[in-house]
């Protein structure tokens, strides 16, 4: 389960626009928002791309994308 709060913070801190991130991911802005709200899950290739775009370390990746018991 994705820690959407932490991911949203990383996006805000990066200064990148969600439209730009969605375009780089090859999905619509709505598709990205569905993932950020927990309606749909990120797939491995999307996680890798987000980590590259946002400069997320492997340690932070685990906290954001693979923590158990994370609240939506």
Which positions does each model-derived feature cover?
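Short alpha-helical elements of helix-turn-helix
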Residues: 4-5, 30, 44-48
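Short basic helix-loop element that most often maps to the first helix and adjoining turn
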Residues: 4-24
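Short, charged recognition helix plus adjacent turn
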Residues: 9-10, 14-15, 34, 60-72
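Residue-level signal for the short linker/turn that defines the boundary of a DNA-recognition helix
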Residues: 16, 42-45
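Recognition helix of helix-turn-helix/homeodomain-like DNA-binding domains
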Residues: 27-41
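DNA major-groove recognition helix of helix-turn-helix/homeodomain DNA-binding modules
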Residues: 45-60
